[in-house]
Amino acid sequence: MRILLVTHPPLTAELGAPQITLRLAAALRERGHDAPVWSPAPVPAGFGSFRRRQTAAIERFAAENGPFDVIDTPVTSASRRLARQGHLVVRSVQPELPYLFHNHAGQLRHHPGPRAAYHAVAALPTAAGLLAGWRRARLILCLGTLELAWMRRRFPFWRHKLGLWTGCPAPEERDLLTAVRRQRATVLPGPGVRFLWIGRWAEHKGTRRLVRFLHERLAAFPADTITIAGCGPSAAEDLPAEWLRTHRIRLVPSFGRAELPALLAGHDAGLFTSEVEGWGLSLNEMLESGLPVYATEQGAVPDLRPDFPTALRQFPPGPTIELMSPAEPGPAYEERFNWASIARSWEIQVQESRLSK
């Protein structure tokens, strides 16, 4: 098949959505498909909203470089014109409606007033656009079982076109993560626990929950420290200056993929505090590197728990931190979570949806 895979951010492995789209495309090419990846970034200036100009750029690219048997795109770009240019697959990289509801509910809760109410009402056309994109899709691939269950409950009339896909590290990164796991000490190396939190500093990532936890934890355990990585420049505004000055908290606003193994190796336990999450590739990365992870029940957590029954733990951590069992993950993990299997599953679901026209 000739498949166009679309991602909105710039095509770089440093960003989550392009990273997993590039990996999926590479795995599909290994299966013999012609699978280019394209991004409209940077979106051209012009008239109309940013989203409309973004979608128009994708429509132009598909028209000028087609025909395509399948067009795999985020739901916000699933337009009528794109649906006419190929078998339209909407592949989720984040739970769009829950994100939208969570963000505006948070604004109304924490900053009530006319401005927050106005923005909540103004988001209704965005929600309508998401519904329209799902309606046009021939196949909706939900990211993880949590999102699939959510979509089935709210949109039972689309059950026939709901599918599932997952994510995992690239093969070359997996080898590095395995090496980190095998070199881990069997006891904590210092008097305190070195926690690691990875993600954008955004409310849906559970930053308020994280800060509340840190106030309690750092007061009760003076030797504990935490690194907050990939957070951008804004995290410092929400954290006490004393914590930063005394290095109880270390901020790493950004890091390259090559720096990830050393970052993981230098910590004892991971934290995952999301309130709404798509998948959370950092979960795979922390667990595969041998870190026990204290996590909220979001993103990939229920999908990964069968393979990490003791390493994947409920947030917040208790007073004692036990290291990860060397028996985890079991052999079934890499059979389920590898890009060859993910691409094969994508292929089967797309072929079935094409036959059901």
Residue ranges and their predicted role:
Residues 19, 23, 193, 200-216:
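A conserved mid-protein helix/loop that constitutes part of the nucleotide-sugar donor-binding site
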Residues 49-53, 179-181, 315-357:
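A charged, aromatic-enriched C-terminal amphipathic alpha-helix characteristic of glycosyltransferases
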Residues 90-125:
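Acceptor-binding helix/loop patch of EC 2.4 sugar-transfer enzymes
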Residues 112-140, 149-153:
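Membrane-proximal helix-turn-helix segments that form the acceptor-binding/catalytic region
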Residues 198, 225-238, 253:
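Glycosyltransferase donor-sugar binding loop
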Residues 237-255:
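Nucleotide-activated donor-binding/catalytic signature segment of Leloir-type glycosyltransferases, i.e.
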Residues 275:
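Aromatic "clamp/platform" in nucleotide-sugar-dependent glycosyltransferases that forms part
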Residues 292-295:
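Short hydrophobic beta-strand element within catalytic cores of glycosyltransferases
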